[in-house]
């Protein structure tokens, strides 16, 4: 064994061994308990970043630990390979998205291997290959036949620069998340999948997810947004149709003083024919964002349409306004306004001088003061005719019943959740498998024409999708009739909604899933990824699983038993202000810093001499230029060091602050482990351990070894507090470093301890542990070694600490055998100088003894 720890030598050697032996390839095995450990698949952007490394290290630690428990562990990886960045990169680099993507995959695959992740590479998949997306296309056509897919015109967030539709979440401050262009609203025909048909099940089944973070479940509950209320119909004077609104607060209905409709509502359009001000307002609304977060903060504006609706219970005429906070896509495109008891309605009414009528008493029973704001709390009704004096629940039911009896109301359950718009006007995505025949009939692409293959040899102009620009691509024939293919492609959330299931049978050619394999591995036992995916990906992931279940492919209701959301990786961020007044962000690698005695940064400059402003720790990002390249760190310290730091620096679900000093500390620790094994093995063979022949000191050390095994097992397995597991191993290592190594049993005990340490560290630092296991002559490869088991007998304490009090005041702490009697403890206590001093010449009137813990002598 060489004396120095040289990770660059051992890591490549061990990785080659894993590759040649196919160590992590698995097949279904009914004789073993399965464990499916999955990290969210990466987008092949070109290089791994530290967020990836953290995510995949956590997954690999769990997978390797479960493997050592003897389970049949599946840990696959693949590539979420479609998407917009590839198009931008292709234009920039004068290539096509496909070669750019495949080059990135090859590069990042090597980076993953360099980090020593134990993946089953035989199951690797890339979502941009026809072998993958053909099954998604087939499934979509089946959903269409089931009535779960439809096409409709819909107002969307349109990025004029990228020429694509953006999801609400992709609109940041009214601009495109990717290119910062101002977003417009546009009506275009799009394909939708009816996720709303599963709204109740998606909501109710959250209760089954005991091992998902409550934050994620709450976000999904709010996103689905189930509410119970009443749909109310209003007659409108001089208008051919009625207006329908939905409210969750029918108890406030007597305070409804105006209605508001969306700018795109037919009533507003009709009114605009003779109203130039309204027509201009409608035009302005076309460029309003449709993201709810934006709508909540934007200025509320409106124009009176001139129409009057009739309040069904009071007969009063109330104005109908067109307002920018009402959307056609949400509900009926019309809302009732109760400005006395809704803050948004109150602000709008105050701005435009509309009537504000209070109908709910304040908590103290007085009339509410509405001079500054609305009273939004529930309470007792007044000013409401026959409903006066009713509380919220009674009023809700009484008004709902009356409206129903009159034929102008109906109780309804509503959802905030909208159907999933899956059309994208981009090139680099899976083609949507629908065709339009010459006679206008729209139908699914026949099975014998699937997959609809995306041509990869294309020229990108950065504006129009090549399959839209080429009129020949869309032409096809169905049933002998000319037809045109759909030129939109799928939202890339489609591919990432079912990849986890395809990993169970990636080579299966008969269909989307091999049910036998899928049902062996599914559900996923632990799914690891960022909390930013809580409502988009993780909701579609659950939805797709239920669709596949209802298609008879899987048996389970939910795709993953446990969800672990890892924290972000933060790093120092620095900038200087350039001559143009803009911030120039400087990489922390290039910052020369001065620190105070507490280690805080007080001054910084770069190599060019710029004084730098230190903004603290923030998420590693390109925009702040504070990303640290994992490859550089691996080349400098080795993969094991990077992995160990990642798992030690912070609990897995908390933010991790990147500190190179911490990385150096992790490296020093691994050098100490190496040195101890080197010194131990240099002394030659070891005798067998005789636990009956150990001295008290040896027993104490062995007790520490087995207590550490018990703690680390609990920390990794049950608590998933990996940082405390590592801390416990480090503490044990400090004790082992000081332990005597001269005697035969000293060395036998050290052998047992080191074999345990190396196995406990193996999930975190597999390369060094693989090597040290061989040097310690462990049986076989460590990859097949069992997890160490704590010896209960070894952990039993021979002695215990008893606190001795005289008249309730602590006078001594004594160590006694665990089986000592009360008399023996009293005798031992009497030998203590301080105790004897207080007993001299007095009578012990009472003795309180708590076995093994406390002796209190009451004297007088």
Curated annotation (Swiss-Prot):
The keyword Protein biosynthesis applies. GO terms for molecular function: aminoacyl-tRNA deacylase activity; ATP binding; leucine-tRNA ligase activity. InterPro entries: aa-tRNA-synth_I_CS (IPR001412), aa-tRNA-synth_Ia (IPR002300), Leu-tRNA-ligase (IPR002302), Leu_tRNA-synth_edit (IPR025709), M/V/L/I-tRNA-synth_anticd-bd (IPR013155), Methionyl/Leucyl_tRNA_Synth (IPR015413), Rossmann-like_a/b/a_fold (IPR014729), tRNAsynth_Ia_anticodon-bd (IPR009080). ATP binds at residue 622. A motif ('HIGH' region) lies at residues 42-52. Its EC number is 6.1.1.4. One of its GO terms (cellular component) is cytosol. One of its GO terms (biological process) is leucyl-tRNA aminoacylation. It is found in: Cytoplasm. PROSITE patterns: AA_TRNA_LIGASE_I. It catalyses: tRNA(Leu) + L-leucine + ATP = L-leucyl-tRNA(Leu) + AMP + diphosphate. Its main location: cytoplasm. Keywords: Aminoacyl-tRNA synthetase, ATP-binding, Cytoplasm, Ligase, Nucleotide-binding, Protein biosynthesis. Belongs to the class-I aminoacyl-tRNA synthetase family. This is Leucine--tRNA ligase. It comes from Escherichia coli (strain SE11). The gene is leuS.
